[in-house]
Amino acid sequence: MATLFIADLHLSLHEPAITAGFLRFLRHEAIHADALYILGDLFDTWIGDDDPQPLHATIAAELYALHQLGITCYFVHGNRDFLIGKRFARQSGMTLLPTENVVDLYGQKILILHGDTLCTDDLAYQKFRRRVHNPFIQQLFLLLPLSLRLKIAAKMRASSQQANQQKSQQIMDVNPEQVLERLRHYQVKTMIHGHTHRPAIHQVDLGKSYGRRAVLGAWHEEGSMIKVTPQNIELISFPF
């Protein structure tokens, strides 16, 4: 019995090794799981479910094959692929989840999220996030021609990379008070997230007890997953 979590694969046509590694993961690891949770940034960018990229169809087919085996795949939107919608979810057999969600695994309640909402010290990003998550702005963007959406996404990505080079590592990490607030609000002792690309399992002082914050790694040189069993929560890295 095991439930698997992954995040921050940033799949794109420019990184075929990561795509191949993910397909192997689905075929050899995920098929043995009770469920698979993808906590955002499965793709490096997403400009709409109508984008005819062959990569999207390949990933959808592989995820749907997992679905047909009776293994549910849950998806939490990330900061790169927040526009993944119901159409792609149907094609891939994924179940879309809210930004923050409490799941009960083997009798243990766990808060799961992408993680960008915890990085409140990055004021510029949080302002950007509020803007692009406005439903009206999203609808307007999706009405634009694909070619224009591609150009806008590329420009936004370039601006983001340039801005991040000028930010401190501390600003781009989670705010500890936000972690405590979420754990207390949802009345849980365990949190799993991605986004920061800093894989670790942290102990969190809750006052009268201790909690855990498990952080997934990004798929760059190797894969990263968290395996939850009735006995343990384990952070695992593995070669592609």
Swiss-Prot record:
Pathway connected to this protein: Glycolipid biosynthesis; lipid IV(A) biosynthesis; lipid IV(A) from (3R)-3-hydroxytetradecanoyl-[acyl-carrier-protein] and UDP-N-acetyl-alpha-D-glucosamine: step 4/6
Pfam family for this entry, one: Metallophos
Hydrolase found in the keyword field: yes
InterPro entries: Calcineurin-like_PHP_ApaH, LpxH-like, Metallo-depent_PP-like, UDP-diacylglucosamine_Hdrlase
Keywords assigned by UniProt, alphabetized: Cell inner membrane, Cell membrane, Hydrolase, Lipid A biosynthesis, Lipid biosynthesis, Lipid metabolism, Manganese, Membrane, Metal-binding
A GO term from the CC aspect: cytoplasm
Record-linked SUPFAM superfamilies: Metallo-dependent phosphatases
Amino-acid positions noted as binding substrate in the UniProt annotation, renumbered to this chain: 79-80, 122, 160, 164, 167, 195
Record flagged with keyword Manganese: yes
Cofactor list: Mn(2+)
Cell location: Cell inner membrane
Catalytic activity: UDP-2-N,3-O-bis[(3R)-3-hydroxytetradecanoyl]-alpha-D-glucosamine + H2O = 2-N,3-O-bis[(3R)-3-hydroxytetradecanoyl]-alpha-D-glucosaminyl 1-phosphate + UMP + 2 H(+)
EC number: 3.6.1.54
Binding-site positions, Mn(2+) 2: 41, 79, 114, 195
A molecular-function term among this protein's GO annotations: manganese ion binding
Record text on cofactor binding: Binds 2 Mn(2+) ions per subunit in a binuclear metal center.
Recorded topology in the membrane: Peripheral membrane protein
Top-level taxon: Bacteria
A GO BP entry: lipid A biosynthetic process
Major localization listed first in the record, in broad terms: membrane
Top-level enzyme category: hydrolase
Job description of the protein: Hydrolyzes the pyrophosphate bond of UDP-2,3-diacylglucosamine to yield 2,3-diacylglucosamine 1-phosphate (lipid X) and UMP by catalyzing the attack of water at the alpha-P atom. Involved in the biosynthesis of lipid A, a phosphorylated glycolipid that anchors the lipopolysaccharide to the outer membrane of the cell.
HAMAP family linked: LpxH
Family to which the UniProt record says this protein belongs: Belongs to the LpxH family.
Protein name: UDP-2,3-diacylglucosamine hydrolase
Biological source species: Pectobacterium atrosepticum (strain SCRI 1043 / ATCC BAA-672)
